[in-house]
């Protein structure tokens, strides 16, 4: 990745920022997906054909026509085929700009979000805004699958390497779902920690649990955005294991009132956005 690309140097991440409380869609900042996909060799043709960056926006407020504050939670899904991902701090600042702005209805807020986010992402974005009474009925869930975290192994290196996946696929063809809650990477710009859980559903040669866990732990000091980490995991698994079918889904903990949950697959649809215990 070109860390000197102007789209990265212009980001507000890590900079002192003025918080605006009047609606301002120009606060949104895009990051071209090709910056990371070029390095993975997947800009022209991605190994996944389904997916989205699913965001939960917990800090959404505006004024109704009488000036009374309103609060809600929004689910946002940015299609993986969009030209850009959306930088998270700019997303937060953009949401803050709704605070002192009057909107006629919740639906008008939803429409504004969809329009602005689609323009920034240069692609399809779906938005659903929920009243709190609707959202509180949603359960807290866990990833289905076998958790691979309780292995008695020694790890003394935390430098990212996909070589941990060498010979990771061995034995009979299986369909299974593996889960780890030990995914941790760092923000590409600020190096702040990003904590997440990852689910890998595949049909292919059975994966060696120890090698897979070592690979996932090697992200611990790795600097990339959430979406980029998931695409890297997907691409590495395709390269090293050549599965018949593959899904990689990560759910990251909240920062600044936002959580990001990238989903990539070559055979499954994007699931319902249900939060986990750490979210």
Swiss-Prot record:
Catalyzes the NADPH-dependent reduction of 7-cyano-7-deazaguanine (preQ0) to 7-aminomethyl-7-deazaguanine (preQ1). It is found in: Cytoplasm. It catalyses: 7-aminomethyl-7-carbaguanine + 2 NADP(+) = 7-cyano-7-deazaguanine + 2 NADPH + 3 H(+). Pathway: tRNA modification; tRNA-queuosine biosynthesis. Belongs to the GTP cyclohydrolase I family. QueF type 2 subfamily. Its main location: cytoplasm. GO terms for biological process: queuosine biosynthetic process; tRNA modification. Keywords: Cytoplasm, NADP, Oxidoreductase, Queuosine biosynthesis. Its EC number is 1.7.1.13. This is NADPH-dependent 7-cyano-7-deazaguanine reductase. InterPro entries: GTP-CH-I_C/QueF, NADPH_dep_7-cyano-7-deazaG_red, QueF, QueF_N, QueF_type2. It comes from Actinobacillus pleuropneumoniae serotype 3 (strain JL03). NADPH binds at residues 88-89, 255-256.
